Amino acid sequence: MASIVLRSRLLPRLAKLRSRNLRCFSAEASSTNSTSRYSGVTSTQSMFSDFPPPNQPPPPPPPQVEAAAAAATGKERKGLKYLGYALLWALTGATAATGYASFAYTIDEVNEKTKAFRESATKTPVIKSSGIDVIDKYQTKLYSAAMTGSARAIDKYLELREIVEEQVKGFTEPLSEKLLPDLHPAEQHVFTLVLDLNETLLYTDWKRERGWRTFKRPGVDAFLEHLGKFYEIVVYSDQMEMYVLPVCEKLDPNGYIRYKLARGATKYENGKHYRDLSKLNRDPKKILFVSANAFESTLQPENSVPIKPYKLEADDTALVDLIPFLEYVARNSPADIRPVLASFERKDIAKEFIDRSIEYQKRKQGQLGQGRFWRR
């Protein structure tokens, strides 16, 4: 009993002592922790106090440094500006020189004029390692690089120009070097009569109320039918093929025209399409070109036979009037038609031929009369 009473008295005291010890321990621990925490923060701040806080701009440089940097930047910008101007002037000069060379000289002439320069550029000067200044050495290297670069640029220009001229040639030159097939051996003596289309055999007109209309020239049927017996007849026009072929089919249903040549067979030069008679695969001594614009529309005016342009005149007889001269040529077969045509001096051949024929008949009759007189 006494032990129970003693135990009940001691337990509350032990509990109080225990709670006091816990309070002291916790207070010391808390003071220790707080002290260590604040001391840690303070030490950390002191260690990194020389660096700016995060996400803050750096301090401005001193005024002298800033002024020097601005001056250096200004010089760099000025240097780049001058360099840009120099490159622009160099590019402009190169473009102008290229354009002038392309306009003034052919590719063969440019190749011949620059041949010596390009050959000298390939001979790079030998740089000796001893006995030469460093500046001279670099100057020699720069000179060699400039010469080599210029020579390569010229080679590239010639290559590109050749490619471009080949492409342009496909549009300006006739489709083939031989526009007509070979003449049959039995027809080697036959002359070739080349006829223009517009204002020569027909006339194309446009009016608002009816649109385009094509009119045959008076006498064209008789002209083709009669001369088809003596000549190889070829139509050579500067119009598109889609126009030439159907028009010729309606113009010549009997097939007196053997071949039809359109714009693709012409040579484009100085903004105009020319007939190149040298590409017909025929003897130029036996070619006659009849056109209302004969001397202006062919590259061989010495083969031209001019005729009055047809402009829908009802009394036009130019084709019929030309038949006697063309028949005379076909029957007599001159060795070269070109001096014969040159003797007419670009006059109206049909009228001039009739006048010459009449004069010849008069002279012939006079000679016959004189012969009879002497025989008496």
Swiss-Prot record:
Residues 51-64 have a biased composition (Pro residues). Residues 186-329 form the FCP1 homology domain. Expressed in young cotyledons, roots, flowers and leaves. It is found in: Mitochondrion inner membrane. Belongs to the TIM50 family. Essential component of the TIM17:23 complex, a complex that mediates the translocation of transit peptide-containing proteins across the mitochondrial inner membrane. This is Mitochondrial import inner membrane translocase subunit TIM50. It comes from Arabidopsis thaliana (Mouse-ear cress). The gene is TIM50.
